[in-house]
Design a protein with these regions (language model features):
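Juxtamembrane/disordered regions of integral membrane proteins
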Residues: 1-194
Length: 194
């Protein structure tokens, strides 16, 4: 099925409040992954934990985005699969250390997986959509750095960063969405095949 993204005239404060509240998907997803599979210590664990967490984060984001964009539930699947692949690849390449640059680099890889998968669905939004994977990758790395700086115990090998990182990530991506959508009509034609 082909999907064309259409902008809704609705939005405003309700949309942005929903996008801000979507940060709750991060701690809920992290707790769900921890409860179901425990610490994320292997690429396989990263893939499974990423899919679980990504599905919950993606669902929270989709609930907010569907008010402004005519996205399908494919957003949830894209987020889950992108996070599973990105987290598994990051662990395979860099291990599970939370010290030094390893943590934000692994976050950059996971974020690139998520952002690239979501971009497939956002590409019909307009000419600014290619910035999305870059912002998500950088935001994911920043989220991990802020979580570490806030003193969260990262030895528990969480699948996703904490609330401080999630709030910052949602702010950064929300501002990016506002910039992407401002004054742009959706290009006609197919956006993605799902």
């Amino acid at each position: 099925m082909k999907q064309t993204i259409r902008l809704s005239s609705g939005g405003g404060w309700g949309f942005w409040a929903g996008w801000a509240l979507a940060f709750l998907g991060f701690p809920l997803g992290g707790v769900a992954a921890a409860a179901l599979i425990g610490p994320i210590t292997t690429p396989l664990g990263g893939a499974i934990g990423g899919i679980i967490t990504g599905a919950i984060v993606g669902a929270a984001q989709w609930l907010a985005l569907r008010r402004r964009l005519s996205l399908t539930r494919g957003w949830i699947a894209a987020t889950a699969l992108g996070m599973g692949a990105g987290l598994a690849l990051g662990i395979a390449l860099l291990g599970t250390s939370t010290d030094g640059a390893t943590l934000p680099l692994r976050g950059l890889i996971a974020g690139a997986g998520i952002g690239s998968a979501q971009f497939i669905l956002l590409r019909a939004v307009g000419s600014r959509a290619p910035i999305w994977p870059v912002v998500v990758a950088l935001g994911w790395a920043l989220g991990w750095m802020l979580t570490r700086a806030a003193g969260v115990d990262l030895t528990l090998q969480w699948a996703v960063f904490g609330s401080s990182g999630a709030l910052t990530f949602q702010l950064l991506t929300g501002l990016t969405l506002a910039w992407m959508l401002r004054g742009h009509a959706v290009a006609p034609g197919p956006a993605a095949v799902l």
